[in-house]
Each structure stands twice: as C-alpha cells, then as structure tokens.
A protein has these predicted regions:
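N-terminal membrane topogenic signal
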Residues: 1-17
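Membrane-interface helix-boundary motifs at transmembrane edges
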Residues: 4-6, 53-65, 120-126
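Membrane-interface helix caps and helix-loop-helix hairpins in membrane proteins
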Residues: 30-35, 57-60, 83-93
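Cytoplasmic-side transmembrane-helix entry/capping segments in multi-pass membrane proteins
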Residues: 40-42, 61-72, 95-98
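Alpha-helical transmembrane segments of multi-pass membrane proteins
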Residues: 48-52, 73-78, 135, 139-146, ...
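Interfacial helix-loop-helix junctions of multi-pass membrane proteins
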Residues: 83-94, 140-225
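Membrane-interfacial alpha-helical segments at the cytosolic side of multi-pass membrane proteins
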Residues: 100-117, 155-161, 220-234
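Short, highly charged, low-complexity non-transmembrane loops/tails of multi-pass membrane proteins
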Residues: 239-260
Length: 262
C-alpha cells in the first residue's frame, strides 16, 4: 500500500509538471501566432484527462505506473515531437514513440480481455496465454490502422507523416539488363527530381521503410507487454512491476467505495 501510495504521489507530481509545461507552451504559441500548435497544446491537456476519465467511468483501475507512462507518451508525442520538432531533430524519436505505443496498446487490449475474463457474466475462462495473445493482436491491429491513417493523410492531404528514408542501395529485378528474374545490387548516390539532381547519398524512399520500421518496433513493444501480462496472470498480485503497469478490474466493493468518493 505504501509503495502504491508513493507511486500515486509521483504520478501526481509528474502530471502537474507536464501540465504546467503544456500550458506554458500553449501561451507561447498564442503569442507567436502559431494557432495550429496552440490547438495541439490544448488537445494535449484534454488527452491528459483521459486516463482518469476512464478510471472513473469504467470498472477498471489504471495503476499509477501505467498512467505515468501514458502521460509522458502524450507529452513526448505532441509537445516535444510535434511542437518542438523532435521528430526532425532526433531521428530515433519516432521509433521510440512507436515502440511505446505498441506497449501501451497491448496494455489496453490486455485490460479489455481481462475484464471479460474476470466477469461473472461469462462462463468461459481464458488462459493467460490467450489473454496475452489477444493483447498482442489488439496492439498490432491499432498499429496497422495508424499506418493506414498516415498513408491516407499523406495521399489525400499532401502531408508527410510517413517520413522519408535515405536508402543507399537497392536490389532490383527491374534494373537487371539481361531481363532475367534475378535481382541485381545497385548502389545509389544521387537521384533526379524534375530534372534537378539531389546528392543525398541514396534513394529517397517516401514511406515503405518508415512504415515497416514502425510496425516492427510496435511488434517489439507488444511482445514485451504480452510477456509481462503472462507473468502477471500466472502470479496475479505477486509481481510488482506487472502490477504497476496492468489495468485491474475493480471489485464490487471497490466500485461502491469509488462511487461514494465521487
């Protein structure tokens, strides 16, 4: 209980600091006249309230450890990534966030299926491995849907959500001068766009590498959480790390106490 209380206090402190930084960012963007970034800041403040909103409205307790990760993830994606251009300044920033996203989406999927698994309304009890597998599939589905969204925004609205990637060499059947169905290795030093030569040190890939990289790291994040979930279900209540990261279904007594507090 003391450890959990300490986590809650730390979560509250982190949330207060992040909220203050977001408010300062919103004010700054307003005076700079950058209303798009100001809107992103306001959206961030709204997203900060989502975990506690779900905690109150659903019969689920979001542990302080997981909520802290969610808050830092939102801040890193919107304020640091978008407004402060960390996606451009730090090449691996996008990779870090997609890995974290895979982890978080697996946590959400785990909570959803575990809620059904522990409900008295359902007679079927699922094994820890099936619950973890569902969490993994849920995370990967969300990751794929996000890549669909990025492609759609780039294709229909002329954005660049699927970041460019410099590929120094390619293996291609199309470029084989013999016409045989055998790929040949081609080193690429420059490319020509509308008659203008760009010495980028490679071929400019406009989305395939970025998409596959995002899905691979999403896979890694989902696998990591799924393993944690299996250990948690097999030793429910014993693992401190797992308990601090996995949403839990509240009992009827806990739900009644929560309702009274509100």
């Amino acid at each position: 209980m003391k450890a959990n209380s300490g986590l809650k206090k730390n979560r509250t402190k982190i949330q207060m600091v992040l909220t203050a930084l977001v408010i300062l960012s919103v004010v700054r963007q307003f005076f700079l006249g950058n209303y798009h970034n100001m809107f992103l800041g306001i959206l961030t403040l709204i997203l900060f309230m989502v975990p506690q909103f779900l905690d109150r409205k659903l019969n689920v307790t979001i542990p302080p450890g997981l909520e802290t990760v969610i808050l830092i993830f939102i801040f890193s994606a919107e304020i640091l990534g978008e407004i402060n251009a960390f996606y451009v300044k730090i090449p691996i920033w996008d990779t870090i966030l997609h890995t974290t996203n895979g982890f978080l989406m697996a946590a959400i999927g785990f909570a959803l299926i575990d809620l059904f698994n522990r409900s008295d309304r359902f007679s079927i009890k699922m094994s820890p491995y099936f619950v973890a597998f569902f969490a993994f599939c849920f995370s990967m589905t969300v990751g794929v849907m996000w890549e669909f969204f990025e492609f759609s925004m780039d294709w229909f609205f002329g954005l660049d959500m699927q970041k460019d990637w410099i590929v120094p060499a390619i293996n291609s059947v199309k470029l084989n001068p013999t016409g045989a169905n055998v790929p040949i290795h081609v080193d690429v030093q420059s490319l020509v766009v509308n008659g203008e030569t760009w010495n980028l040190g490679g071929y400019l890939d406009i989305g395939i590498v970025d998409t596959m990289k995002d899905l691979i790291v999403n896979f890694i994040g989902a696998v990591v959480f799924s393993v944690i979930g299996i250990l948690y279900l097999r030793n429910r209540g014993k693992g401190k790390l797992a308990a601090s990261l996995i949403p839990q279904v509240r009992s009827k007594q806990e739900e009644e106490l929560s309702s009274r507090d509100q």
